[in-house]
Amino acid sequence: FTAFPKVIGIAAVILLTLGFIPGMPTISFMVIAAGLGYSAFLLSKEKQKKLAMEIESEQMEIIETEKKEPENVMNLISVEPMEVEIGYGLIPLADEASGGDLLQRIASVRRQCAIEMGIVVQPIRIRDNLQLKTNEYVVKIRGTVIVSGELMPNMLLCMDPTNENTDIPGIRTIEPTFGLPAVWINKDQREEAEIKGLTVVDPTTVMVTHLTETIKAHAHELLGRQEVKLIIDTVREKYSAVVDELIPDLMTIGEVQKVLQNLLKEKVPIKDMVTILESLADNSRVTKDIELLTEYVRFALARTICRPLIDENRAITVVTLDPKVEEIIGANLQKSIQGTFPAIDPDTTGAILNSIKDVLQSVYFYENQPVFLVSPKIRPAFRKLIEMIYPNIVVLSLNEIPNDVEIRTEGVVTI
């Protein structure tokens, strides 16, 4: 009843009215009416105060929510540098309780990339995605799907590069990383396949290999300014002189980043940061051209670049360009913000690419790694000309082959 002061006020008015009727106890009614009226007034004020407090509390909650809102929005719009999404059928591969070791294997991939390429890969997020197929996985870089594949979690992948052992029963497929013909086999077939000399791997290895090669192919995209700063700060601990000379007086961290990205784009390791920074410190006084500075660094890293291309006889097998081809490319160089590129007509470009295709089919390269040797002037431009069609071809200039290495020319690109 006390929750309704308006009702009490009405009752007070009624009693006051009754007190004026002849024969009624006027004084008693007036006293009671006055008491009820005062009570109604107090209750009304209390209710207004309580309502005001409730409104103020709601406003404070709204304000607090608004204060937190920017943080929540930032969490929603932020993207991971790199992440792996898996279908629910592959969850056991990442579940330690089920014997899965995917998390540990991916952590080892980051260490492997640091050792081999010298890059700092941020922690790779792994999560399930119910929108994927049951046994599908995708690798994303900054929110964009780069590669994908499907696994058979309870089977093994058997690969035969020669494609001669086609009698093995199983599910025919294509190995996702290198595009080799493969077969998913039962686990009890492993011994039979290995006796035939075939390569047999588990599903986790298939995914981890795919992830590793994806990181190597897109390392330049993963190397941001923050990662470069971390690398430079590490170098500064032991080699402060070269870092202090170079940064920030001669080059910014962003400019160093662009040089490192150029190297990684052609799969040149950046582990030897001291040599890289020494070269930049020497040459950035003469030029600020990022492409030219990259070429100077490549010259300084010549032995590092050539090491995996040299066979046991200290020789390197290469394909060269016909002087006419070199002349055409050299005479049509155009400079842009993205670097130097050859402005060649489509017919000539097609003829060069077709000749490259023919040469690749006829030449055997060490470790099956095609190497093209061109003049220093056109090396960056020739690389840009072929990289969309032949991204895995190594393009070297004469400056990048050490003097104690024999050059064996096994093919020539002509038009």
Description of each model-found segment:
Residues 47-415:
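Membrane-embedded alpha-helical signal segments
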Residues 1-41:
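Transmembrane helix-loop junctions at the membrane interface of multipass transporters and ion channels
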Residues 27-31, 42-55:
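Juxtamembrane/interface segments at transmembrane-helix termini
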